[in-house]
Amino acid sequence: MAATFSLIGTIEPFLHCNLKKGDSIYCEANAMVMMESNLELKGKLQGGLMQSLMRRFANDESLFQQQIEAVNGEGDCLLAPTLDGDMQIIDVGAQQYTLSDGAFVAAQTGVDIRANIQRNLGGAVFGDTGGFMVMQTQGQGQVVVSGFGSLFEIDVTPDKDVIIDNGHVVCWDSNLDYKLSVSTSKKKGIMSNIINSVTSGEGMVLNFSGTGKVIICSRNRDSYQGWLQSILGTSSGGRGGNSGFLNNIL
């Protein structure tokens, strides 16, 4: 029997994991908040060295992920993502998902998070979707994702394409097609689209089509970082400069 996941709390919840003896889960580095003494935590190159390096390149994740195993008997642990925000437990198997940068929190051992070559060149060059690599789920079980702020699930249907600001996308159904552009305008000229993007205040957007769902978050991490920099300043001169501080927390 696989370990079970549940969320505790309504605002910035904990991820509660219950493991029977012999069960294990894996999670992003530093996600563990608390665990009972029957559990054992160790760093592991999940999927081997090559996949670990590819995940590092794709999503700037830690090379070693945490593996928590119930070695001495049943036990519970609490996990939390790095940034403020909500989490969602997703069932994978019949449906697989593509994850944006920093979205992965934890997964059952039946699920593999693999770095694959991105099929969308525009997203590879300009998007927050992992550069030329994207993180995709494989296998069967549950994976937990997080986003900055509250999460909301959007259904995409063949008769209803959806345009989403790139910085608000957490994950999406891998069956969906997506295109990245610099504007929500339907004009075809690249300069007019760039001008519209600048004047409207919108940056990159993703246009999803097909059938599937997209999970979005209410806050944009990059915009928030820019706002903090405007308040605190970006000077990096001297020890403890604000730029270094911001880089450490974001």
Predicted regions and their residues:
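Composition-driven recognition of glycine/serine/threonine/acidic- and proline-rich low-complexity segments
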Residues: 1-250
